[in-house]
C-alpha cells in the first residue's frame, strides 16, 4: 500500500484510506490469507492512532468494500453499544494496539490455517529439520 500518514479534519470520510484498506482485504482473500473467522485489519486515520477504520463483523474479506469499513474511536467506551459495533475481539485487540502504539498505523490479524493448527497443539514447538 502506498498510504502515507496525513492529518485530516473530522469531517473527512477517509476515502483514500478506505479504498486502500478494502483492497488489502481483497488481496488477503485472493492469496488465501483469510481462513477461519475473527480476522481483522485496521488502519489508524489520525495522528495519535485513536481513530481507526476496521472491517465490519461477519463480512468475508473478498466482499469488503471501502464503504463497509467502520470508523472507530479507541477512546469511546460506548463503541460496543453501536449497531455497527466491531467484533469484541477486534475491539479489544485493535483498540488496545492503536491506543498504546500510535506508530502502528495498520494492524493485520489473521488465523492462517496451519498457524492455527500449530498453535492448537499441546506442544506447538516446531523443531528444525536437519
Annotate the PLM regions:
Residues 1-130:
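Glycine-rich flexible loops
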Amino acid at each position: 500500500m502506498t498510504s502515507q500518514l496525513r492529518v485530516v479534519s473530522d469531517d473527512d470520510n477517509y476515502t483514500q484510506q478506505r479504498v486502500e484498506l478494502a483492497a488489502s482485504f481483497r488481496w488477503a482473500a485472493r492469496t488465501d490469507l483469510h481462513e477461519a473467522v475473527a480476522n481483522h485489519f485496521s488502519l489508524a486515520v489520525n495522528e495519535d492512532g485513536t481513530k481507526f477504520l476496521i472491517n465490519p463483523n461477519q463480512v468475508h474479506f473478498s466482499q469488503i468494500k471501502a464503504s463497509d469499513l467502520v470508523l472507530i474511536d479507541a477512546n469511546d467506551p460506548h463503541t460496543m453499544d453501536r449497531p455497527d459495533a466491531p467484533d469484541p475481539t477486534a475491539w479489544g485487540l485493535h483498540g488496545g494496539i492503536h491506543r498504546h502504539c500510535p506508530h502502528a498505523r495498520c494492524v493485520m490479524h489473521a488465523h492462517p490455517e496451519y498457524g492455527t493448527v500449530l498453535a492448537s497443539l499441546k506442544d506447538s514447538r516446531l523443531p528444525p529439520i536437519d
